[in-house]
Amino acid sequence: MDRVVPAVLAGGAAGAAGRWAIGEFGWSSATNLLVVNTIGCFVLGIVIAALPEREHPIRLALGVGVCGGLTTFSGLAVELAVRLDAGDVGEAVAMGMLSLGLGLVAFLGGRAVPA
């Protein structure tokens, strides 16, 4: 446990730095969000498949730390709320469905990699 906390913190910092770096490509906030969440789901699929022990320190560092720092569910909520507030219900629904669909496909694809 003593080694896990610093590893998760370092992983979280790396993930957050990755999210910031992806944001520097100049894409829209919606595209950035879709990219980071899809990458995070793919990586998490690999991590969970490769390290099935739930409390494995590397799984925690990569899954909770890196993937947790990279992805953002709250960012998705903000993007959807902005669209709903603007009256763009169809766009909000499409974005939500696309995010969930791509996330699931990416996770399943990542989970298949170690096999």
State where each predicted segment sits:
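Membrane-interface helix-loop junctions in multi-pass transporters/channels
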Residues: 1-115
